[in-house]
Each structure stands twice: as C-alpha cells, then as structure tokens.
Amino acid sequence: MLWLGVNIIFIFLIPILICKSFKLSKYKTILLLLIFITCYPSRMTLNYGQQSLFVMFFMMLPFIFFNKVSSIFSGLSYVKYSTGYIVFLNFLASKQYKYFILASIPYFVGWLIYFSVSSSDPLINFFEPIQLSLKKGYIRDADIFSLINIYFVPAKELYFKLLILLIIFIINFILLIKINKNNDTFFKMSLVFICPLIFFPHSNYDYVLLFPILCYSFLDTEYLINKINICFVLYFFYFNRIINHLIDFDTLYQPILLLFLIGLVITNIYSYKNKDNLYFFNLKFY
C-alpha cells in the first residue's frame, strides 16, 4: 500500500511539474494530466507495483532544475538500469561531466552499503547488473538489443552480447550528441526519454517515457510534426495493447513499432528549428 501511495503521488506530480516548468496553459495541463492518469502505461505501473514512474521522476529532474542537487537525485533512476542509464550517458554526451559524477553518487553509496552489509566481493557486485542481464538473457521483442539477440544465433555467446552492447551504447551516444545540439531543454528531454525504448529491453509500463514528447507537442499543435507526435503517443497510450492482442503477431508487429519509434526521433531532430528559424515541417491541417 505504501508503494501504491508513492506511485499515485508520482502520477500527479510528473505531469504537473512538467507542464508548470515549461509553461503550458492550465487547460492543456489539465488535459495532459487526465491523459497521463488514464493511459495504459500509468495504470499498469500502479496495478503491478512497478517503478517506472519513480524512475521517470528522477530522470526528469536535471531537465527541470538546473542544480547539483537535482543531478545527484537523478542517479536514483539507475534502480532500473535498462532505463536509467540514459541519464548518465546524456550527461557525457552533453559534456556535463560534473553532473555525471554527481549523478553517480547514489549508485556508489548503494554499492558501498550493499557489499559492506552482505560481506560480498565489491568488484563482482559492481558489474553484477550487466552480468546478470547478459547471462539470464533479459530480452523483450520491441528494441534493438532484444531483436539482435532473438534473430542472430551468435548473440547467444557472451562475447557477442558484449560487442553488441558496446555498439548500441556508441550509437545511442551519437544520437544523444545530435539531440543535444538543440538549445530547447524541453525538446531535448522529450527525445532523450525515448532512447531507452529504442535500444534496450522494456515493458509496456515503460512507455510512460513518451509523455514528455506529448507535452512538448502540445506547446504548438499547428505543425504537422507535432500532430504526428500526439497521434503516435496516444496510440501507444490507449490502443497499442488492444491492437497487439487483435493482431497477435509480435514477430512482425513489435519491429514495426520500433521502426516507427526510430523514425519519430529522427524526424523530430531534423524538423526542429533550423538556423533560419523556420520549421522543416511547417504543413498545417485546415
């Protein structure tokens, strides 16, 4: 019951904090709050007692509060390392090395406490999350890492998994560098949060990470790219699970969703304001 109460607080706090920080109108704030409360990923997080809302809250702190304290607390997102890793990688990609060190404090404190209390080998504990993930074969079917492990026979070998992991991190890092070339913090947060959904295993409740790009798109709904963003996120929030069950063919359905997600990120990057202050996609619906 305690954890349910914490998740309920987060389900209200996250949309209110985002909308207030980036100055969305009261009407849009209420609408987005209702969407976030009623969407399937949020409800699933509450029902199953998952930590997606907890992780998302601490992930977004450095984008909202530009101080050392928020950077330190952002490190708590690493409790779900397949998602929280993006905080650390983004600090490196944006050359915020001081914040990277600060965000590492919670992890190192937890690591010190754990191996001290358990009297276990500190080196083994430090790399244990990655080791367990590789050996136990933690995969899904809607991300690059999982699909490679499913369809490539050599991926069953540990050395191949390590190689793929390294390549994925490099690609993700390059993508983050591209994202961070923009000056709009809200825009950057929206795309950074999508990266874990593209590169590493996740579940349906992790799609709460799409909420920032929905909020960002509500800032200006005149442009085609924002309309596409809104439709895409609402599909994930309300229709994805239903359509998936009706089709019942994950082998094809999940990779297609992944391609759309990748396309969404790339399209948003190149449709952002260019040096002439014009939108690349400025078509409007009348």
Where are the predicted features?
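Short alpha-helical "patches" and their helix-cap loops
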Residues: 5, 76-79, 103-106, 224-232
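Transmembrane-embedded, aromatic-rich helix segments that form part
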Residues: 71-77, 82-93, 104, 208-210
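Aromatic-enriched
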Residues: 218-286
